[in-house]
Amino acid sequence: MKKHGVLNSEIAAVLASLGHTDTVVIADCGLPIPDGVKRIDLAVEIGKPSFLEVLQVVADDMAIEKVTLAEEVIINNAEVNKEIERKLIEPAFEYVSHEQFKEHTKKAKAIIRTGEATPYANVILHAGVIF
């Protein structure tokens, strides 16, 4: 049994398989998940687990080069945006329209669905390298 890092076997396998620039999405419970993209559904009820809880665990276990967010989060969910910026200090940040964000999710290795039910609580994590 693992002692550290991500314990969820599906998430751990996805993170272990990532190459440089591959992407993983952490999403609220409302983001549409495109056909053909691996869905890892963690939602058990509204708000659980939260977007920020899942982001923290995944970010602690992943080399992240860049972060993509929907620009709408800045106004419509400023608190979550601030927390993302606080938790993820190193990577570059990119803001795109929500429609562009949804297009980008079609290329993700996986989308991790949380129980979060606040607007635009979604992030695309772009894998970096560990050296």
UniProtKB/Swiss-Prot annotation:
Enzyme Commission number(s) from the entry: 5.4.99.62
Enzyme class at the top of the EC tree: isomerase
Binding annotation for substrate: D28, H98, Y120, A121, N122
Domain of life, per lineage: Bacteria
SUPFAM superfamilies (alphabetical): RbsD-like
TM spans (from-to): none
Catalysis: reaction(s): beta-D-ribopyranose = beta-D-ribofuranose
Pathway: Carbohydrate metabolism; D-ribose degradation; D-ribose 5-phosphate from beta-D-ribopyranose: step 1/2
Keyword annotations from UniProtKB, A to Z: Carbohydrate metabolism, Cytoplasm, Isomerase
Any one GO BP annotation for this protein: D-ribose catabolic process
Active-site feature positions: H20
Main location: cytoplasm
GO cellular component: cytosol
Location relative to the cell: Cytoplasm
MF GO annotations: D-ribose pyranase activity; intramolecular lyase activity; intramolecular transferase activity; monosaccharide binding
UniProt cross-references to InterPro entries, sorted A to Z: D-ribose_pyranase, RbsD-like_sf, RbsD_FucU
Function: Catalyzes the interconversion of beta-pyran and beta-furan forms of D-ribose.
UniProt similarity note: Belongs to the RbsD / FucU family. RbsD subfamily.
The protein's assembly and partners: Homodecamer.
Name of the protein in question: D-ribose pyranase
